[in-house]
C-alpha cells in the first residue's frame, strides 16, 4: 500500500512540515524537487499549491492532502473531509477572508459596493457572497499583492488575514467577514473506501491532531511530601487533574500534570513555596485524547 499525500507548497509548507515532525514524521524537502522525502515507506509526498490540492485529490491523482477549507469551497471539490487541523502559517488558529476597503472611503457595508470592482484570489466564493447579499459588482482575479490595489485598481478586496496587520499597513479597513477557514486533511472518495489507505489516514489524523493538542503545552512533574500535597494541588489550575503516584518512600508522592506553557513561569515558584521538590518541566510533542 502506498498513500500519495499532498503537502501544501507556499505559505503553509513550513508549518505543515513542522506539524508532521511533531507528529513523528520526518519530511525532507529540496528546492529542486516537488517530491519531498518522508521516513515512512507507506507514504509518498508531493508538494502542491493549496489552491489546487482539492482538485487533485478529487480526481484521484492524490489519495489525500492538506489544504484550506477556503480552497475546497472555492473549487466545490467532492472530497472526504478527514480532519480539521487548526493551524496556519503564523499562528495556530483559523484565518479569515475579509471584505476590506480603503480607510478613507465612504464604504461602510457590502451594499455600498454596488457596481464597484472587487479584487481577490477567491473569485467564485466572492461571487457567491455578493449574490447572497444581492449586490452586483465586478469581481476580478488578483494574482497577488491584492492589498495595494485599492483605490486605484479596485474599490475593495477580499483577502485572507490572520492578524489584520497587512491590511492596516495598507490603510484598509474590514467591513465584513466572507469566510472563516482552517487547514483540513482531505481524502479522495475511492481512497477513503480502501481499508488499508483509510487505516493509514486515520493513523495520520490521530498523530497530527495529537501534535496540535500539544502545542503551547508542557508537562510538569514534581515530588511532594504527603503533608504538603493539598497546598501543592491548590497551586495548580482548578480544572487540571494531575496524576498522583506513591514513591518508594510512602511519605512522598509524585505529581505529574500538563499545563499551558505561558503559565508555568508563574506556577513553578508557587509550587516550590508550597513544598514541591525536584520540579521538572518537559516539552510535549503529542497529546492523544
Curated annotation (Swiss-Prot):
InterPro entries given in the database record: ATP-PRT_HisG_long, ATP_PRibTrfase_cat, ATP_PRibTrfase_HisG, HisG_C, N-reg_PII-like_a/b, N-reg_PII/ATP_PRibTrfase_C
Regulation: Feedback inhibited by histidine.
SUPFAM superfamilies recorded: GlnB-like (SSF54913), Periplasmic binding protein-like II (SSF53850)
Cofactors: Mg(2+)
Catalytic activity: 1-(5-phospho-beta-D-ribosyl)-ATP + diphosphate = 5-phospho-alpha-D-ribose 1-diphosphate + ATP
Gene Ontology MF terms in the entry: ATP binding; ATP phosphoribosyltransferase activity; magnesium ion binding
UniProt xrefs under Pfam families: HisG, HisG_C
Subcellular location: Cytoplasm
Enzyme class of the recorded protein, top EC level: transferase
Cysteines engaged in disulfide bonds, as pairs: none
Principal cellular location given in the protein's record: cytoplasm
Swiss-Prot/TrEMBL keywords: Amino-acid biosynthesis, ATP-binding, Cytoplasm, Glycosyltransferase, Histidine biosynthesis, Magnesium, Metal-binding, Nucleotide-binding, Transferase
EC assignment: 2.4.2.17
GO CC, any one term: cytoplasm
Pathway: Amino-acid biosynthesis; L-histidine biosynthesis; L-histidine from 5-phospho-alpha-D-ribose 1-diphosphate: step 1/9
GO BP, sorted A to Z: L-histidine biosynthetic process
Protein function: Catalyzes the condensation of ATP and 5-phosphoribose 1-diphosphate to form N'-(5'-phosphoribosyl)-ATP (PR-ATP). Has a crucial role in the pathway because the rate of histidine biosynthesis seems to be controlled primarily by regulation of HisG enzymatic activity.
Family listed: Belongs to the ATP phosphoribosyltransferase family. Long subfamily.
Designated name of the protein: ATP phosphoribosyltransferase
Primary gene name: hisG
Amino acid at each position: 500500500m502506498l498513500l500519495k499525500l499532498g503537502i501544501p507548497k507556499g505559505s503553509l509548507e513550513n508549518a505543515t512540515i513542522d506539524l508532521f515532525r511533531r507528529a513523528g514524521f520526518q519530511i525532507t524537502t529540496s528546492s529542486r524537487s516537488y517530491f519531498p522525502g518522508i521516513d515512512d515507506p507507506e507514504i509518498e509526498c508531493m508538494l502542491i499549491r493549496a489552491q489546487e490540492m482539492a482538485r487533485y485529490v478529487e480526481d484521484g491523482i492524490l489519495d489525500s492532502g492538506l489544504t484550506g477549507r477556503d480552497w475546497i469551497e472555492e473549487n466545490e471539490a467532492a472530497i472526504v473531509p478527514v480532519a480539521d487541523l487548526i493551524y496556519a502559517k503564523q499562528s495556530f488558529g483559523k484565518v479569515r477572508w475579509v471584505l476590506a476597503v480603503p480607510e478613507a472611503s465612504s464604504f461602510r457595508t457590502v451594499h455600498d459596493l454596488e457596481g464597484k470592482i472587487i479584487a481577490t484570489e477567491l473569485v467564485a466564493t466572492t461571487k457567491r457572497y455578493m449574490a447572497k447579499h444581492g449586490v452586483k459588482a465586478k469581481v476580478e482575479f488578483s494574482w497577488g499583492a491584492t492589498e495595494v490595489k485599492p483605490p486605484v485598481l479596485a474599490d475593495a478586496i477580499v483577502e485572507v488575514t490572520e492578524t489584520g496587520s497587512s491590511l492596516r499597513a495598507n490603510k484598509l479597513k474590514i467591513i465584513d467577514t466572507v469566510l472563516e477557514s482552517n487547514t483540513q486533511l482531505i481524502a479522495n472518495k475511492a481512497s477513503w473506501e480502501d481499508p488499508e489507505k483509510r487505516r493509514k489516514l486515520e493513523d495520520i489524523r490521530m498523530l497530527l491532531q495529537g501534535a496540535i493538542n500539544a502545542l503551547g503545552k508542557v508537562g510538569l512533574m514534581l515530588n511532594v511530601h504527603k503533608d504538603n500535597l493539598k497546598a501543592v494541588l491548590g497551586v495548580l489550575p482548578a480544572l487540571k487533574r494531575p496524576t498522583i503516584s506513591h514513591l518508594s518512600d510512602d511519605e512522598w508522592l509524585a505529581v505529574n500534570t500538563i499545563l499551558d506553557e505561558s503559565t508555568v513561569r508563574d506556577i513553578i515558584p508557587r509550587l516550590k513555596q508550597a513544598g514541591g521538590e525536584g520540579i521538572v518541566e518537559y516539552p510535549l510533542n503529542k497529546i492523544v485524547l
